[in-house]
């Protein structure tokens, strides 16, 4: 009973605070939550598995993963997520013929690769995976119902088309002018805007037997309508995909689903992610343009977190520019946070001298409160993620200014409970929690040397690094005591060589600390 009341309260508050962009109205609207439902449905259009996925696909799924994480973590919504896999399509048939293999074998190969790619990108897999060929009988029944209701017609070759002129609200997502019927094309497609629900098979192509119309296979749009309806019924809370799917795919989905279920609107909130362009180009990355970068190629040069940070630094509806400059920016932002966590840990562990400044502590706690409030406001504004990252960076800078403050003196060593450790820890853990909530795995405590490693090899490596750092610290203390320039050069040289090995050394008075820099999450 308490949980039901809490959920009703929290979702009501969410509907009041969160604003989402509505592509139909061209404005932001409150989130509509059906409080009687025990879960929130979230359906994503998956790939047609005829080839390897590229980073244009990756940007869409990483961005949607970020949105789902925000809905779950920040707004405590009980999402149930689903994604389809289109494993029968003209492109699959053609590619299988080119490679002289069975079409099912080809589809399974690229489907397995797709799920593997999502895992490597730290994208949470959907709660339910819906493969088209596992639901052919349901698709046939969906098509038959639309024919019986008078919204679809059968052509002389056994194909079935949806008649767009029969649905007055066609063009709901994107304005469409329905042209007059082609009277000379009797027996076939009646209007240019009519779309295939069922495609009659040609010789040598895979097919399924369907009573009432010809043997064949599903059209593209009917697949998602059937699969989502099969799982979630006559109402979807969220339906997501790339901006290029808004028309005709999502338009046609919405149309046929409203007619099938006899509802005014099938989807409450459409979420469309912006496309990915190469730096300096104005057209999207696509296989037809032969300008794609595979996910495997991406992860050879960059970590999954670096690509995720690239996605976080722009609004999910905006175009992402991909290239060396953009990726260096994303990498640098990540590295600044990693360096901050290393500094903070060194301070808390006593490797950096403690600071004693009550005014600075109060200022930091005020900054923490301000950042919390700002992040909530940004996320409420149609999932703005770029500004929260900037706000967290500013908070991290405030912490670093405090722990590197000159207000460090042995004269305060007798004071009890007067250091800034509590405020530093509070701000540090808040920043870490936020970044982890966006799916940035390397922001966890396991990204530094302070966590217990489960690998004996890593443990040995860390002991070796500790020994090197400790020895260097002794040399450095000797250099300070004797003012020996040559010893200082040796210390600097060792620090630079460790940096090449992605180990960052930092000196704190008489002590030093280290952390892994730019460790890949692959």
Segments and roles (model prediction):
Residues 5-50, 65, 74, 116, ...:
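Alpha-helical recognition segments enriched in aromatics with Gly/Pro capping
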Residues 25, 30, 34-122, 483, ...:
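N-terminal, positively charged nucleic-acid-binding surface of large information/translation enzymes
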Residues 77-80, 150-156, 501-506:
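Short, well-structured beta-strand/strand-turn elements
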Residues 82-88, 111-114, 124-139, 157-164:
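Short, glycine/charge-rich beta-strand/loop segments that flank catalytic centers
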Residues 94-97, 252-254, 521-522:
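Short low-complexity, flexible loop/linker segments enriched in glycine and/or proline
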Residues 96-103, 127-133, 214, 242:
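The substrate-binding groove and active-site-proximal loops of carbohydrate-active enzymes
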Residues 283-285, 292-522:
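Structural preference for alpha-helix termini/caps and helix-kink/transition segments
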């Amino acid at each position: 009973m308490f949980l039901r009341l809490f959920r009703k309260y929290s979702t009501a508050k969410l509907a009041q605070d969160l604003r989402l962009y509505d592509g139909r109205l061209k404005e932001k609207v409150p989130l509509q939550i059906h409080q009687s439902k025990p879960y929130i449905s979230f359906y994503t259009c998956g790939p047609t598995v005829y080839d390897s996925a590229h980073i244009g696909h990756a940007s869409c799924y990483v961005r949607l993963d970020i949105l789902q994480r925000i809905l779950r973590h920040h707004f405590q919504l009980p999402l149930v997520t689903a994604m389809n896999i289109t494993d029968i399509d003209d492109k699959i048939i053609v590619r299988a013929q080119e490679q002289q293999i069975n079409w099912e074998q080809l589809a399974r190969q690229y489907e397995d690769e797709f799920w593997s790619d999502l895992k490597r990108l730290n994208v949470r897999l959907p709660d339910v995976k819906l493969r088209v060929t596992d639901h052919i009988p349901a698709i046939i029944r969906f098509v038959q119902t639309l024919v019986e209701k008078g919204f679809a017609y059968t052509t002389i070759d056994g194909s079935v088309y949806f008649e767009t002129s029969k649905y007055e609200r066609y063009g709901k997502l994107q304005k469409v002018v329905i042209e007059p019927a082609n009277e000379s094309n009797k027996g076939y497609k009646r209007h240019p805007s009519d779309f295939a629900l069922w495609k009659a098979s040609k010789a040598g192509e895979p097919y399924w037997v369907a009573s009432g119309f010809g043997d064949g296979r599903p059209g593209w749009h009917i697949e998602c309508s059937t699969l989502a309806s099969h799982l979630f019924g006559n109402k979807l809370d969220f339906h997501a995909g790339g901006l290029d799917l808004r028309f005709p795919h999502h338009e046609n989905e919405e149309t046929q689903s409203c007619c099938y279920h006899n509802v005014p609107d099938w989807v409450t909130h459409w979420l469309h992610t912006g496309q990915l362009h190469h730096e300096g180009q104005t057209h999207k990355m696509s296989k037809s343009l032969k300008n794609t970068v595979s996910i495997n190629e991406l992860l050879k040069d960059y970590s999954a977190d670096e690509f995720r940070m690239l996605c976080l630094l722009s609004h999910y509806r905006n175009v992402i520019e991909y290239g060396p400059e953009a990726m260096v920016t994303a990498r640098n932002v990540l590295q600044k946070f990693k360096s901050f966590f290393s500094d903070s840990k060194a301070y808390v562990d006593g490797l950096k001298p403690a600071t004693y400044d009550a005014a600075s502590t109060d200022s930091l706690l005020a900054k923490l409160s301000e950042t919390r409030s700002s992040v909530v406001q940004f996320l409420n504004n149609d999932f703005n993620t770029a500004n929260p990252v900037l706000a967290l960076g500013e908070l991290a800078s405030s912490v670093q200014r405090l722990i590197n403050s000159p207000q460090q003196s042995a004269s305060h060593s007798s004071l009890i409970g007067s250091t800034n450790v509590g405020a530093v820890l509070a701000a540090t853990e808040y920043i870490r929690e936020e970044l982890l909530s966006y799916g940035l795995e390397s922001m966890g405590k396991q990204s530094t040397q302070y966590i217990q490693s489960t690998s004996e090899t890593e443990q040995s490596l860390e002991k070796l690094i500790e020994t090197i750092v400790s020895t260097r610290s002794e040399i450095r203390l000797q250099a300070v005591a004797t003012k020996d320039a040559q010893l200082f050069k040796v210390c600097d040289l060792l620090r630079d060589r460790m940096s090449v090995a992605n180990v960052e050394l930092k000196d704190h008075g008489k002590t030093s600390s280290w952390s892994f820099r730019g460790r890949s999450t692959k």
